[in-house]
């Protein structure tokens, strides 16, 4: 589980895997909605759990990709921190699925994104999905200002550049999201995981609405400039969709 995940607040002390049983109804409604929009839309389907992980238990993602690929209009998209994609590679997605892999420096994965796939495996999953014809993106998220964060993210970008396939590098898009961290999350983690890394830093963060801590604007602006420049140095033709 990830110590910063908002699902920790939903479930109190653990981001449990949520599995729905009315998936046929939900999928029918999704496909129906896709045909009623004025223009083609992209539907985010991965907000309640990591669908790659859930798929290992339920097979729901396989069914969703196949059905939306055949009947849906527009695209569906989901993020993941897991690399178990082999079951998806041969599916007829018809270009209607956007696969987004979340990436972070290996030390953050090991100590803060506990139990998720290592960086090398995540990159290999991106290469596999790209080769299988899926639209693919990298989600550099959340950016966390740990000690030596600039060096860590430079190393991450270098690793991505050296390990991604040429096909993936030519087709990916990139999203960047800075960490937000709620008051409730901080209290839960202090009680449930007293030995875990401390994510709240009063010097770097400030409260701003809805019970959340954000990085102070001056630090965030500096980091955005730094990351945009370093991403562009390595991935000059790649779209940075947003930095938030």
Task: Identify the meaning behind each predicted range.
Residues 49-52, 83-86, 99-116, 142-147, ...:
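Conserved radical SAM core fold
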Residues 127, 131-180:
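A beta-strand-loop signature enriched in Asp, Gly, Thr, and Trp
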Residues 40-44, 75-77, 96-100, 135-139, ...:
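Structural preference for beta-strand elements that scaffold enzyme active sites
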Residues 58, 99-102, 149-165, 194-201:
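Short, electropositive alpha-helical surface patch
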Residues 86-106, 173-180, 198-203:
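Non-cysteine beta-strand/loop elements that form the S-adenosyl-L-methionine
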Residues 4-100:
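Conserved Radical SAM active-site core
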Residues 29-36, 87-92, 119-132, 227:
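Structured alpha-helical segments in the cores of large, soluble enzyme domains
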Residues 161-244:
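Auxiliary Fe-S-binding modules of radical SAM enzymes
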